[in-house]
C-alpha cells in the first residue's frame, strides 16, 4: 500500500475558530480546548460523589449454559479468507464485538444465539461464556481498565463479570436495550433504553441514576472524553447533552436544531469540544459541546437534491449509519446506508471525498494518529481508505455474510469483525508508513 506523506497537512489548515460554518453566519462562541486530559483519579473521585438512587432489582438467572465444544475455533473457511483466526462458537449472527482496552488481547462477542463469549485474539481460545441471557446479546464491552466486562441483551438484561475470576458480579433488568457504554475513567456503566431513559450504574455495588428523556427510545449515546457529560440521541430527533453528576440536561436540541428522524449514531472528537450526530434523515450535524449550538450540517451530494423531510418522516433509501472524527486532521467521515463514505472538511464544511461501496456501510472507525479510515459493509468486506486522497488502500475478506460490527486494536495491527455468518474473525493489518 502506498500513501502520500501527510507532513504539513494539518499545519496548513486554518484553525476552526477562525472560520465560519454557515456561509455568512458568524461563529457565536469560540470553544477553548482543554490543555490536557483530566486526571483519571479526579474523575473517579467525582463519580464517587455522584448521588445514585437505590434501585430494586430482580435476581437474574444464575444457571450457566452448556459451552459449545472448543473445536468450534477454526483457522480458515472455504474460499478466500484473509483472516488469521476465526472464532466459531456462536450458532447465529454475531452482533457486537469489543476489545479489552488495556492490553487489546481479549475480545467479547455477543450474538443472536443469546450468548456472549470472552476469548483470546491470538488463537481464538475461549476464556469463559457470559451465561444467562434470554435474548439476543446486542451490546458488550470492557471497562476502562479491562477488569470488568459487561453484556446486554435486547430485553434489557445487563450483566457484568470480573475478567480475572470469570465470575458474575452484577446484573440488572432495565427496559428494552438500545445502547450501552462504559465510563472512560471509572467503573460506571451507562445504557439507553426504549422507554427514553438513560441509566448510569456504579459497578458492582449497583448504585443507580436515571436521566429521563422524551417519551421515546434513547437510540444512541456517548460519554464525552471529560467523563462529566454524555450526549444522547432519541427517536424523535432530539439531542440532549447531560451533566452526569447533576443528572440534568445542559443542552437540548430539538425542532430544526435537532434531526427530522430517529438518531442512529453519535461521536465526539478527541477533546470533546465537538459532537457529530447522525440520523435516518440522512443528515450529520456538527454540534458545539460547549454551547449546544449546531455549527455544521452535512448531507451527501447524492441526496442533496432531495426535498427536506417533514417531522417524523424518514429517508426511504438512505440514512447515516456511522460517523467519526479524524484525530490528526480536521476531517470527519460519515457512512451511509447506500454505501457512500463521505469525507468532510470541518474547516470549510465541504465534501472532500466520496467513496462508494457496493453495499451499505455498517460502521466506520478512524485509525488513531493517521488519516486512515476503516469501513465494514453488508458485502462482508473490511476496507481501508486514505482520507487525504479518497483512495482505497486495501481490503480484507473472509466472511460469507454481512459484517455487523468490528473493532480495531489501538496500534491498528488487528481488525476484529463479527458477521451474519455466525463467525468472528481476526485480521492482521499490514501497516506501511502512513
Swiss-Prot record:
Localization terms from the record: Cell membrane; Cytoplasm
Task: Mark out the compositionally biased spans (Acidic residues).
Answer: 39-62
Specify the superkingdom.
Eukaryota
Please tell me where this protein is predominantly located.
membrane
- Keyword Coiled coil appears in the UniProt entry: no
Pfam families in alphabetical order: WD40
Q: Name one GO cellular component term.
A: cell surface
Which PANTHER family does the entry link to? ANGIO-ASSOCIATED MIGRATORY CELL PROTEIN, MITOCHONDRIAL DIVISION PROTEIN 1-RELATED
Function per UniProt: Plays a role in angiogenesis and cell migration. In smooth muscle cell migration, may act through the RhoA pathway.
Q: What is this protein called?
A: Angio-associated migratory cell protein
Chain's gene name:
AAMP
